[in-house]
Amino acid sequence: PLYHAEDLGFFSLDAWREEAMPTDVPRQELFSLDRRAWHLLPGRLMHPPFEEKVIEDRGEYELVRDRGGRHVLFFKGRRNGFMPQYVDHPVKDRRTWEEEVKWRLDPESPGRFDDLPELVADAKAAASRGMIIRVRIGGYAYIRNLIGTLKVLYAFYDMPDLVHDIMQTWVRIVDCIVARYQEHVTVDELFFGEDICYKSGCFISDDMFREFFLPYYQEVVKGVRERQLDPDRTLYVQVDSDGRVDGVIPLYREMGMNVMSPFEVAADNNVVELGRQYPDLVMCGGIDKRVRIRLSSGLYEL
């Protein structure tokens, strides 16, 4: 059966480290937590990634180029525990796509699979313990991270040929990476990190989704199903998107989605009603994340 745990994270890691919390002990062991029931095989698309470096010192903040080529504004000396500001993205037109990014997505990049034996060994060991083997491959988030949250919406109108080229390149590299894993292990779950919705619904129309995403998603899912070492094993296809998702569920069902998360309460997702409409859809989440920031005692309301 599919297993999923909502991870609410840790609120005081920085303070605990200052108070001599061991940093060489896995957190699950340190806090006596249950082990995760899934094992993640990385969907590392860029090889080589961009060199991460500080571009500008802004006093309390620092502007950093991350491994995906984005310019990100962080609090100085901190990378986790808050939402940074994304200032710039690597793809602005066809020239920047081809010169800065596309060559990094070449399936034949030297050294891309140097660590495959180690990754496969870990995955096989996890599978032998009954863990779900998950591959996170991105999707809408992939192209949004390349172009930018707002600019990608204009790109569908202004640069449709470029968008198709970017998505076709995504299919080739994802297909190659997952296929290499599937030579050795059966994949239990494809995880699409989307965040394609906001509080009121999807960022793009149904027609746009069908033109720029659905056929590529269907191609990837079809290929994974056909290559499974264990053809009788259920392939879970999970779509993760914040925002209100009721309008996109039928679209994602067309590409084979059978798991969805996190059904944000703040975006008026009614998990009871949606569960009635889609009784065979595995639904994860439905937790009001705002509770944890009201009062510390509010955590017990969850």
Protein language model regions, located:
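Short, surface-exposed linear segments at secondary-structure transitions and domain or protein termini
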Residues: N80-V91
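N-terminal basic, low-complexity leaders that serve as flexible interaction/assembly modules and, when applicable
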Residues: P1-F74, R78-F82, A121, S128-G130, ...
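Active-site loop segments of alpha/beta catalytic cores
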Residues: P1-F11, A15-E18, R65, R94, ...
